[in-house]
Regions:
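Phosphate- and other anionic-substrate recognition elements at nucleic-acid/protein interfaces
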Residues: 2-11, 15-101
Length: 101
């Protein structure tokens, strides 16, 4: 019996850099891929990573403040997710809350 293994690519969007991690449903242990500079070439690098990893799901962290409210960075992360979805690559984009506590 063949097992379906899902590959995940995760992005943590910051002001100057985007942290990138990779995981799969079999090993279930994420590991750091590296960082991408936030600049005019960021989406080219994201496209390269999508082609290399071929994830079934892209996970993007959505930061929240201590009260669980959205912040300016939340909007930046959501916009990044929209750009990933617009690349035309068949991948599900999911947002995951990152609440400061």
């Amino acid at each position: 019996m063949t097992k379906n293994v899902h590959h995940f690519l995760a992005f943590d969007v910051g002001e100057k850099r985007i942290g990138v991690a990779q995981a799969d449903s079999e090993v279930r242990m994420p590991f750091t891929v590296g960082t991408i500079s936030v600049d005019s070439l960021e989406m080219s690098r994201v496209r390269e990573l999508l082609a290399e990893v071929r994830p079934s799901i892209v996970v993007i962290g959505l930061p929240r403040n201590q009260r669980g409210e959205t912040t300016a960075q939340t909007a930046v992360s959501q916009a990044f997710g929209d750009k990933v979805a617009a690349l035309g690559v068949e991948v599900m984009v999911q947002f995951v809350g990152e609440a400061l506590q």
